[in-house]
Every structure is written in C-alpha cells, then in structure tokens.
Amino acid sequence: MKLQKPKGTQDILPAESAKWQYVEGFAREIFKRYNYAEVRTPIFEHYEVISRSVGDTTDIVTKEMYDFYDKGDRHITLRPEGTAPVVRSYVENKLFAPEVQKPSKFYYMGPMFRYERPQAGRLRQFHQIGVECFGSSNPATDVETIAMAAHFLKEIGIQGVKLHLNTLGNPESRAAYRQALIDYLTPLKETLSKDSQRRLEENPLRVLDSKEKEDKVAVENAPSILDFLDEESQAHFDAVRQMLENLGVDYIIDTNMVRGLDYYNHTIFEFITEIEGNDLTVCAGGRYDGLVAYFGGPETAGFGFGLGVERLLLILEKQGVTLPIENALDVYIAVLGEGANIKALELVQALRQQGFKAERDYLNRKLKAQFKSADVFAAKTLITLGESEVESGQVTVKNNQTREEVQVSLETISQNFSEIFEKLGFYTQ
C-alpha cells in the first residue's frame, strides 16, 4: 500500500500556499481591469473534447493524457489544458447568443493533468491561469491580450522577459506552408529524430519546435511561414506588429515557433525568460478562430493564453523576487491559568469579528513558550490575560516590536480594538 503522494504531484503547504494565493489574487486584479470574468469548468471532460480540439496527433493526446473509462463506460480524461474546456462551456451554455455582450472575456484558474516526466517547474498535476476572449477577429484583440500578459508579468516582477511572436496564417496559408515543409523535410527524413519522423507524416509543423539537436540542424534552412502568407494573413500580422509597436511592446519574430496545439491560426506568441542558461516559457497563447465552430457553435473568433503557476513561482524564486505577502498576526493572546480560558476565547472571537487576525494559546504552556509563539507568528500586539486581569477587567496591550504598552479595559478591546491598535502605531485598513 502506498501512502505517499503520487509521482509528479506536490503538497502545497502553508508557507507556499500564501504565494499561490498572492499570484492568483494578483492575476484576478489585472484581469478585472481588462473586463474579464471567471469561469470554472470540471477537471474531467469527455475524451473527445480534448482529443478532437487539441489534435489527435499532438504529444498531449498521444502520450500525456490521463484518460479512463468510468463505470458507465464513458471515455473520460482529466483536462490537460484549459482552452478546450472553456470553449466547450462557451458553446454548451450558448454564450454566443446575441444578448451576451461581445467580445466575451473569461479567465480560469485550476489544476491540469499530463502524464510526462516530472522536472523543475513541470509536474503531472500542474496549475494553470489562463484567459479566453471570444467574438473579435480584430488584430487589436490579439494585441490587447498580449499586452495584458506583459502587464501581469511586469507588475508581478518577472525580469528579462522577451516576447516571441509568429503567425500560422489562415487555413489556406497554413496548408500551403505545410506542403512546402513536407517537400523540404522529406529528403532529410532519415536525419530526423524518431518523434519528428512520425510528426513529418502527421503534423510536420511540429518538427520546427523540436528540442532534439538533429531536428534543429535539419530545420535551420527550412522555408519560413512568412513567405506563404496570403494577403489576408499578411495584413493581420502586419497590424498586430504595428499595434504592439504603438503600445511600446518589444517583440522578436520567431518563425520556428508553432505551439503544441493544433487549433491555432494567425497570431501565436510566447513570453520567454532565461534561467540558469535555459530558456523557459512563462506564458503562451494565440488565436483560434475555428474552435467554437468545431464544437458546434457559430463561426466565432477566439484568442487566449495560459501560464503555469509552478513555472511562474520557480522563475520568481530563481530571480530572487520576494512577493509582498502579509502573514503577521495582529494580536496574540497569552493565557495564564484555567480561570482565563473562557474570557480568552470570548476576547479572541471579538477581535476576529472586528476584522483582526488573532490567535491565542490553547496548550496551557508557560508564558515564555507563549511569547515565543507570538514572535514566530510575527504578532504585532501581545495581550497577556491571567485570572487577575479577568477579575479586574483591565489588561496590558503591548506593541510586540517596540514594547510600548497601554492599559485598557477588556470591554474596550471587545468593542473597539482599532483605537488601541492605532495608538500603538499600527493602522487598520
């Protein structure tokens, strides 16, 4: 019997979960400024929702999916990414209806699952924050969404981020480029890695972003997608580039970037930063104008991105970025004697109901041990409550940093601790 966590998963303990809550709250605040609303979808979906939209030949579907048959013999998969479930929800709930304002903007947060080799910043259960925007084919939507990602990364403190940009064009441009790539790579097939030999038959564009050395050599002189764009595709990409420049967002054209999912068209992008000599993608996404119709909805443009929370936190740690997390207690009550037990319970509850973060001793320890706990909790103020204080109704409240003290009534603490808190040099929000 295994009583440990499964391989590729982690327990997020309190010291770490505070960072997660900060990142999630920070993302919510940024997304709200751009008029995005949260959507929550199931963590498991029908297998076809993922396989048909992400692509039957992608690594996600062929190698990495957690899928199974449930007791009703339904083929189920744990979601490996966030876009397909959100699109499925958009169509199933008829959010394309005329009365729903367009563009429709959604964000999501939650666990995703892929069976892959666990490594730094990459787990089998990982967490993603993402956004999806439906109903606008305007290149300004591409740019606004990319700018929102840049805004988030800059404000949270990620350093040295570079925006890599490419286009896959419309279906006609992509088909022409696909054939040109097949014609170029077929004579080189024997020099490719085994995976890329398979990709050449199924999805040749995926050979371009292979990390294998032999594949990188093979594609060095490959044709560029930019040479196969028709007028519509070229105009869209030119507009995206111009608007990014208007907003002062620097970018690098990366024609070997294709993204790992089949549903993209036109603009695709990645934000990349270097950590210990390795390029790490922190956020990526693009346009997917055919996906809503693929799920049975009307022809609807889409654009979005996703970022991995574990990867983001790893980069912040490696770059020495300290998140401004407030963990300190406002009040710690040291309790002395059985006669003070009930009053301490009443007092700590009254403080919490006034909005203060408060804790008390429950273990009947010596005062020295209780004072140490107050220090460990970084308590701003300290109240020592014994039987004599209960009898007199008066107690000392101490600033646990400066040691300044004030003598006050228990009734005042129960009803208006803010006044005491401010008198000792702290401010209430």
From Swiss-Prot:
Its EC number is 6.1.1.21. The keyword Cell division does not apply. One of its GO terms (biological process) is histidyl-tRNA aminoacylation. Keywords: Aminoacyl-tRNA synthetase, ATP-binding, Cytoplasm, Ligase, Nucleotide-binding, Protein biosynthesis. It holds the Pfam family tRNA-synt_His. It catalyses: tRNA(His) + L-histidine + ATP = L-histidyl-tRNA(His) + AMP + diphosphate + H(+). One of its GO terms (cellular component) is cytoplasm. It is an enzyme of class 6 (ligase). It is found in: Cytoplasm. GO terms for molecular function: ATP binding; catalytic activity, acting on a protein; histidine-tRNA ligase activity; transferase activity. This is Histidine--tRNA ligase. It comes from Streptococcus pneumoniae serotype 4 (strain ATCC BAA-334 / TIGR4). The gene is hisS.
